[in-house]
């Protein structure tokens, strides 16, 4: 047997290695329903939302997550990955703040509650169809962790549909309706000012359909061999 078969290069801080490491840590957490999170979800960090409902736009994702849950893996394909940072996140003082002190602040809980409120306001999604996992990280790692997981999982609300994570733009900041608010009516109607028309719904749906091409295989590639075997027998 040649030496090439007995060794392999491994860089523990390469983006792919870091993404896999963070992904494994996140997958090791039991997913909870988004509408049943406790205030104990504290500290800064990153999180993933998972969908298991009937909305036709996300049928491939919902089907895969439901099969994974039946296999005892919990949901495996995030619909959205985001971050929760403390106020003043750009200041050096916050970046160097003691993580133990930040753990007492409901930073993750606040951000996830904002997402829950967004979902509750729209007419074609239900909160009970969403699950969440959250991973507490020191602020200095949060942005990197979020970016790596978005690349790792390719969540549809990060890649193909923009606007889920935005806030009310306010009276002095008129803007176009986001892609997410075009597909899911209700949230934007509660905001301070009417929004200008955004991208046509048909064009957004085309983006989503293109996103699903080869998507399932790429998600399965993120799983460990053992977890993949457990799931593939059901697909």
What are the residue ranges of the model-derived segments?
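Boundary/linker segments flanking structured domains
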Residues: 1-79, 83-235
């Amino acid at each position: 047997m040649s030496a090439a078969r007995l060794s392999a290069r491994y860089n523990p801080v390469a983006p792919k290695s870091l993404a896999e490491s963070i992904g494994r840590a996140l997958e090791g957490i039991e997913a909870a329903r988004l509408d049943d999170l406790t205030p104990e979800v504290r500290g800064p960090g990153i999180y993933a939302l998972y969908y298991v409902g009937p909305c036709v736009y996300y049928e491939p994702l919902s089907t895969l997550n439901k099969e994974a849950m039946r296999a005892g893996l919990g949901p495996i394909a995030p619909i959205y990955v985001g971050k929760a940072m403390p106020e003043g996140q750009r200041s050096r003082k916050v970046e160097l703040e003691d993580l133990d002190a930040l753990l007492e602040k409901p930073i993750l809980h606040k951000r996830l509650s904002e997402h829950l409120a967004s979902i509750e306001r729209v007419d074609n999604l239900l909160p009970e169809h969403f699950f969440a996992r959250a991973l507490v990280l020191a602020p200095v790692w949060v942005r990197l962790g979020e970016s790596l997981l978005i690349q790792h999982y390719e969540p549809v609300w990060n890649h193909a549909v923009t606007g889920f994570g935005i806030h009310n733009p306010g009276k002095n900041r008129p803007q176009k309706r986001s892609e997410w608010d075009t597909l899911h009516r209700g949230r934007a109607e509660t905001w301070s000012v009417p929004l200008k028309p955004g991208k046509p719904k048909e064009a957004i749906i085309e983006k989503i359909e293109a996103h699903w091409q080869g998507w399932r295989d790429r998600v399965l590639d993120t799983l460990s061999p053992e977890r993949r075997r457990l799931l593939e027998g059901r697909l």
